[in-house]
Regions:
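Conserved phosphate/anionic-ligand binding catalytic regions in large, soluble enzymes, centered on
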Residues: 1-6, 72-81, 149-153, 163-164, ...
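Conserved short alpha-helical segments that host acidic/polar catalytic motifs at enzyme active sites
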Residues: 1-151, 155, 159-194, 346-349, ...
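Short, glycine-/Ser/Thr-/acidic-enriched flexible segments
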Residues: 4-6, 64-67, 77-79, 85-88, ...
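Acidic/histidine-rich
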Residues: 53-87, 358, 363-391, 420-423, ...
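Generic C-terminus detector
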Residues: 127, 146, 153, 446, ...
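Active-site phosphate/pyrophosphate-binding segments
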Residues: 160-164, 168-197, 277, 287-419, ...
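Glycine-rich phosphate-binding loops that contact phosphosugars or nucleotide phosphates
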Residues: 188-340, 421-469, 487
């Protein structure tokens, strides 16, 4: 079982059995056993059980009395069937069986699959025949292997220059205009948009926070950013003039998928930013921008974040181009800077020794804080998330301007604090952040400062200095996140 059965407590009360655990998985197992004991075959039993379950889940079952049959079902949770030579595989992602077969079948919503020696049969929960989509995986097998790295995550951190370049590839025409072939929304419809709502979870949510700054600056359209888990359970104000942008690496994030369905019920246009071709989220959206990052095996997203930023920047620039809110030379200038980004990221990765040494010094710290302002604030949040996810160290990200409204009380002697300093191009922001650094340092914090190499003021207030390349303010999250990813990975 993968996922969450939301009504498992109520179902548990209906079962007159002794439970060995508190898991929702055991509830599903007992329900299946009861149906089979009553004479149902495993397929019928599975259909009877899943119609009673609420939530997002995938179930796979085998009957000990009939071991040559595997039955699985999915609702709001991914499930793919690998089709090999005389063999079949079940997994949530093709990366699990790519070394055995590249041919696969993706199950749709509320479907049951039966695997036997004779083949694969897919039906809907109501027992009617189901439509399925077969596809061939064409990415390199090495993408699902560590290739000498100790972790998939470390490998994926070092794949970011290529992933960013691939996401940018083919996005402009011979005139230098942005071309997003996947956007199946007419220019007239895009010009009628009067509000943008970005919906995402986790790391993708932080990418959305960065996108808000860029999109509002370039398009002058109000932009909101919402957690999908909150958006779907309230009554958001959206209508046909709202553009909903969803961000999901897998394309199967349950809360984000539910948010899309809610938005479409309100007749809003939906654009998905996704890394997985043919996943549920892009299929249910009006348009999609694929990030072309390649498979992300590591649970903690790295290249997913940077390529999502690239896709968000491209969308913002495309909207500015269509709506005429930025001149062509301004858009072209940003595009040229983005095209240089793979080289900038590679230089950061080549200079990793500085970050690795810092990780060795701080690996036993019980708590680490992250501070940022403007687009540096989402970078601080993402840096803290990476450390929590990987090293299980308490970490928090704060907006620098909120320092006096509570976070300053957490500062004690020797507390490590990462600070992202804005570029010289935003002097007012930069000066305020440097003032924040001086303030926390005066209270005993150990400051790890990320700033442009030639920023002598920032360097003067740093106990440890991490050099960033010189980029425009809105694009700074791309290089700034890389040292924080490396740090979290090495500490873990």
């Amino acid at each position: 079982h993968n996922g969450i059965i939301e009504n498992h407590a109520a179902l548990r009360e209906d079962l007159d059995v002794e439970f060995a655990s508190e898991t929702d998985s055991e509830v599903a197992a007992h329900l299946l056993a009861r149906e089979v004991s009553a004479g149902a075959d495993l397929v019928s039993a599975m259909r009877a059980v899943v119609t009673r379950l609420e939530g997002a889940f995938t179930l796979v079952a085998v009957d000990a009395a009939d071991p040559d049959r595997i039955v699985a079902a999915r609702r709001n949770s991914p499930l793919v069937v690998g089709i090999g030579d005389g063999e079949y595989f079940l997994a949530s992602d093709v990366a699990a069986f790519i070394e055995h077969t590249r041919d696969a079948m993706e199950l749709g919503q509320d479907q049951v699959v039966e695997l036997t020696r004779d083949g694969v049969v897919v039906t809907n929960f109501d027992a009617t025949p189901a439509d399925t989509r077969r596809f061939h995986v064409d990415w390199d097998l090495s993408a699902a292997q560590k290739q000498g790295y100790d972790w998939f995550m470390r490998k994926e951190i070092f794949e970011q220059p290529r992933a960013v370049a691939d996401t940018l590839l083919g996005r402009t025409n011979e005139l230098g205009e942005i071309v997003l072939d996947e956007i199946r929304i007419s220019p007239e419809e895009l010009r009628s948009i009067n509000k943008i709502v970005i919906v995402a979870c986790g790391t993708a949510f932080y990418a959305g926070l960065v996108a808000k700054y860029a999109i509002e600056h370039w398009t002058r359209v109000p932009c909101e950013v919402e957690l999908a888990s909150e958006f779907r359970y309230r009554d958001p104000i959206i209508d046909p003039t709202t553009l909903v942008v969803t961000i999901s690496q897998s394309g199967e994030t349950a809360d984000t998928l539910m948010a899309i369905r809610h938005a479409r019920e309100q007749h809003a246009k939906v654009v998905a930013i996704c890394n997985t071709n043919g996943a549920t989220i892009p299929r249910e959206s009006d348009a999609v921008i694929y990030t072309h990052a390649g498979p992300e095996i590591g649970v903690a997203s790295t290249k997913g974040f940077t390529t999502q930023l690239i896709a968000c920047y491209l969308l913002g620039l495309y909207l500015a181009q269509v709506r005429g809110t930025k001149y062509a030379d301004e858009i072209g200038g940003v595009l040229k800077e983005l095209e240089r980004m793979p080289e900038e990221l590679q230089e950061l990765l080549d200079a990793q020794e500085n970050v690795l040494n810092l990780a060795a010094e701080l690996k036993d710290e019980p708590s680490i804080l992250f501070l940022g302002r403007h687009v540096g604030y989402p970078v601080a949040l993402e840096g803290a998330l990476k450390l929590k996810e990987l090293a299980y160290i308490h970490a928090e990200g704060f907006a620098a301007g909120e320092l006096k409204h509570g976070p300053i009380a957490l500062i004690s002697e020797g507390l490590p604090m990462f600070v992202v300093v804005p570029p010289y191009s935003r002097d007012q922001l930069r000066d305020k952040v440097i003032s924040n650094i001086a303030e926390v340092r005066a209270r005993g914090a150990r400051t790890i400062v990320l700033a442009e190499a030639n920023d002598a003021d920032a360097r003067a207030h740093a106990d440890h200095f991490i050099e960033l390349p010189r980029v425009s303010t809105l694009l700074q999250p791309l290089p700034a996140i890389v040292p924080l990813q490396l740090f979290a990975c090495e500490v873990a």
